[in-house]
Amino acid sequence: MADHHRDRGVLGGGALGERGSHGGYGYTGDHGGYGGDDEQHQQKQPVMMCALKAATAATAGGSMLVLSGLILAGTVIALTVATPVLVIFSPVLVPAAISMALMSAGFVTSGGLGVAAVSVFSWMYKYLAGKHPPGADQLDHAKARLASKARDIKDAAQIRVEQAQGA
């Protein structure tokens, strides 16, 4: 019966479910139990973990190295096969590529300007609906300054017209 409990880690004086100093359950660090010397166990674990980490890293690194070599070889073969075709068709492909680039730039520009127009219309709707969008205060201030300057110019023009008629 004692051997049965020793295998379960109960013999060391701790109860099942009680964590010992080595991080396991049941073994409390008593050297009379199943684990042998606790310090020796702690030293072996990091060495084994380092070896396991090194093996995992070597496996992952090796497979990535093999994959990168295969991709490089495939790229070289593809360029070797495609170069004569590109040289033969370059009088057609270069203008086609330029046309595609210009059309793509046109579509992107058109889309960007469309988004800008929608955002401006949205801002104007919010402003006219009285929802006070960002920048509405600046617009109101600029509108007031412009109206003030227009009044000043109108008054100055009226004064000059009256002076010209009176003279």
UniProtKB/Swiss-Prot annotation:
GO cellular component: membrane; monolayer-surrounded lipid storage body
Membrane topology: Multi-pass membrane protein
N-acetylalanine found at: 2
Entry's transmembrane regions: 69-89, 101-121
Polar, as annotated region: 2-53
GO biological process, alphabetically ordered: lipid storage; post-embryonic development; reproductive structure development
Compartments where located: Lipid droplet; Membrane
Region: Hydrophobic, residue numbers: 54-125
Keywords noted in UniProt: Acetylation, Lipid droplet, Membrane, Repeat, Transmembrane, Transmembrane helix
PANTHER family: OLEOSIN, OLEOSIN 18.5 KDA
Functional description taken from the UniProt entry: May have a structural role to stabilize the lipid body during desiccation of the seed by preventing coalescence of the oil. Probably interacts with both lipid and phospholipid moieties of lipid bodies. May also provide recognition signals for specific lipase anchorage in lipolysis during seedling growth.
Family membership: Belongs to the oleosin family.
Descriptive protein name: Oleosin 16 kDa
Species: Bromus secalinus
